[in-house]
Structures are given as structure tokens and as C-alpha cells.
């Protein structure tokens, strides 16, 4: 009888211990939503996450790049070297030159234009100092580099021709440039003065602002 009671007490103690241990064990942590997903769902989500970062980088790469306009050249040589001459209207010589047409599209204030002219040992240099419109045509004006204040250069841009007038202490020049081909004709006003008095000595044309040339040919 005593043994039976002891066995019953031992069984009760062991059962109580097991129940207490079960009550004291912490509940297993709840799985995260990602862990609860099936392996197939996780495998499908992985490529989407991997593509998200490159897509953002691609968006940044496709952002428009600011367009920068190149600065105008400080010095432009329209033509250089000795000019070829031919007899023009009324026997007055014309001197021929060749200009790169694109150069006349890049005129800018402060720019120095350089060109060789008949009767001058060194190329003429003139700096563009002002611009305005006259009769709908752009006009540029400037003075000679290291020249006298009375010396000047005027450029009138037409759609077909560009007219350039140069006034120096030694005489004046009229220049006509074909905008499309760049072919250029230079007329020395001293030749016109000599033509008016063929029997006299060579006389430099007086320094003066040239009378307006006919407007450049328009399309």
C-alpha cells in the first residue's frame, strides 16, 4: 500500500514538472511575412528587387544633359596672304579672296577680325565693339587694333551677301562676300581715285567714312 502511494506521488510530481516546463517554455517567434512566403514566391520576388536599383540608376543616367554653347573665338582670320587681282567694272581692279562662310555666322562683340588688304604690308586687325540692326539687317562696327580713333570697320550681314567697309589713314576699302561660296571681292578706293585722275601722281583717297554701299543682296 505504501509502495503504491509512493508510485502515485512520483508520477504526479513528474507530471507536474512536465506541465510546468511546458508552461515556462517561451512561445516560438512569429515568422516574418517574407519567411511565411513559399519558396516559389520568394524566388519570384528576388529578381524584382534586384531590378529596382538598376532602374533607379537608369533614370538618373537618362536625365537630360545641359547644352553648352561654345564660346566664340577671340580672333578670326577671314583671309590671309597676297590677293589675286583682276580688272573689274570700269577698269578698276578687284582683289579676290576666299572666306570660310561659317566664320561670318560667329561674329561676337570683342572679337578681332583679321584680313590682308592691298597696299598694306601687314594684315589689318579690327575689334568689333558694337552691334545693331539697320533695315532688319545686323550691323557690326569696330575700330582698328592699335589704330587711330578715326579708323573703323563696318560689317553688314545680308542673307546672300556680307558687305564690309574699312576706313584707314591710308585709304578705304569696300569688300563684298558671297555668304554661300565665301568668294570675296575687295576694292581699294585708292584705285578709284587714281582712275578719276589717270595723269596725276598716285593720291591716297582722303580718310572718310565710306558712303553706304547698296544693301547686301537678299534672298
Swiss-Prot record:
Q: Where is the composition biased (Basic and acidic residues)?
A: 191-204
Q: Which UniProt keywords apply?
A: Cell membrane, Membrane, Metalloenzyme inhibitor, Metalloprotease inhibitor, Protease inhibitor, Transmembrane, Transmembrane helix
Per UniProt, subcellular location reads as:
Cell membrane
Q: What is its main location?
A: membrane
Q: List the disulfide bonds.
A: none
Pro residues composition bias: which ranges? Answer: 209-219
TM region positions: 4-24
Briefly describe its induction: Constitutes an operon together with PA2783. Its expression is up-regulated in biofilms, while it is poorly expressed in planktonic cells.
What is its membrane topology? Single-pass membrane protein
What is an example of a GO molecular function annotated in this UniProt entry?
A: peptidase inhibitor activity
Q: Where do the record's region annotations for Disordered lie?
A: 191-219
The record's GO CC annotations read:
extracellular space; plasma membrane
Function, as annotated: Inhibitor of the metalloendopeptidase Mep72. Forms a protein-protein complex with the protease, which is the product of its coregulated adjacent gene, and probably prevents premature protease activity until the protein has been secreted.
Give the protein name, as stated in the record: Biofilm-associated metzincin protease inhibitor
Source species: Pseudomonas aeruginosa (strain ATCC 15692 / DSM 22644 / CIP 104116 / JCM 14847 / LMG 12228 / 1C / PRS 101 / PAO1)
Amino acid at each position: 500500500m505504501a509502495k503504491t502511494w509512493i508510485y502515485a506521488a512520483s508520477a504526479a510530481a513528474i507530471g507536474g514538472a512536465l506541465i510546468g516546463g511546458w508552461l515556462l517554455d517561451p512561445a516560438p517567434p512569429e515568422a516574418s511575412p517574407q519567411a511565411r512566403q513559399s519558396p516559389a514566391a520568394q524566388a519570384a520576388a528576388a529578381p524584382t528587387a534586384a531590378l529596382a536599383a538598376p532602374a533607379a540608376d537608369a533614370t538618373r543616367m537618362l536625365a537630360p544633359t545641359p547644352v553648352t554653347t561654345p564660346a566664340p573665338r577671340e580672333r578670326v582670320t577671314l583671309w590671309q596672304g597676297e590677293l589675286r587681282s583682276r580688272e573689274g567694272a570700269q577698269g578698276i581692279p578687284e582683289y579676290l579672296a576666299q572666306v570660310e562662310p561659317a566664320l561670318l555666322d560667329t561674329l561676337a562683340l570683342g572679337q578681332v577680325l583679321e584680313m590682308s588688304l592691298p597696299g598694306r604690308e601687314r594684315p589689318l586687325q579690327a575689334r568689333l565693339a558694337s552691334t545693331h540692326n539697320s533695315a532688319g539687317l545686323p550691323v557690326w562696327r569696330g575700330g582698328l587694333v592699335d589704330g587711330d580713333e578715326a579708323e573703323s570697320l563696318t560689317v553688314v550681314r545680308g542673307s546672300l551677301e556680307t558687305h564690309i567697309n574699312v576706313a584707314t589713314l591710308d585709304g578705304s576699302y569696300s569688300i563684298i562676300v558671297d555668304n554661300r561660296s565665301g568668294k570675296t571681292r575687295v576694292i581699294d578706293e585708292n584705285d578709284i581715285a587714281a582712275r578719276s585722275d589717270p595723269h596725276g601722281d598716285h593720291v591716297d583717297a582722303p580718310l572718310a567714312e565710306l558712303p553706304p554701299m547698296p544693301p547686301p543682296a537678299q534672298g
